[in-house]
Amino acid sequence: MSRIDLHRWQSAQTAEFGHHQDLRMSAYSIATKTIGNLLGIDYEKDFKDKVIVEVGAGPRGSILYTKGTFKRGIVVEPLIDRWPPEIRKDYEDIGVELIVAPYEDLEIDEQVDETWFFNVVQHVLDPTEQLELAKKTSKVVRVFEGLCQTTDQAHPWTVSEELFTNVFGDFGKIFKGGTVEGFHSADCYYGTWYASDNV
């Protein structure tokens, strides 16, 4: 894969922003709870003293469900300032640092404990580059991503299981779309990769 150009990426962000405008807040709650159950995590208890990076968190990122129990929380969200100010405030109120830039362009000079990709890699400059950066800089990488073979304005990339296995090896499972009411209709790849298992 090679990066899409910046103009194409920006148009994808605009289209994705429009999609989020149509979602009810309850949809984010269902998504976060379902992802947490599938990955076997307790948001409030499992991340104390951890440095967490959530990529493309949207207006109601999963990190909000930690209620600030992390050591350091970072959200990389290029759209954050397009939403009403209270969205930014919700993150800042629990101590989350917000970065308004593409994840691929970050210089991460410390190893973080966790990097999360939940429904984001279809919208980025380069999915492989993002995953490789996370692998290099994170002790744990958590993934829940829709699989798709078509592209559109908001989704410039197709996503297959091989996108993840080519970077991390076979670490995940397939979620069958439509099996949880109010949640993903598409099949998804999910799992947790541990650097300690791959040394």
Regions found by a protein language model. Give the residues of each.
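Class I SAM-dependent methyltransferase Rossmann-like catalytic core
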Residues: 1-44
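Short catalytic micro-motifs in class I SAM-dependent methyltransferases
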Residues: 119-120
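A short, conserved alpha-helix within the catalytic core of class I
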Residues: 123-134
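Conserved class I S-adenosyl-L-methionine
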Residues: 49-58
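Class I SAM-dependent methyltransferase SAM/SAH-binding core
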Residues: 58-104
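Conserved beta-strand signature within the Rossmann-like core of class I S-adenosyl-L-methionine
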Residues: 138-149
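A conserved beta-strand element that flanks and buttresses the S-adenosyl-L-methionine
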Residues: 116
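Short alpha-helix
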Residues: 156-177
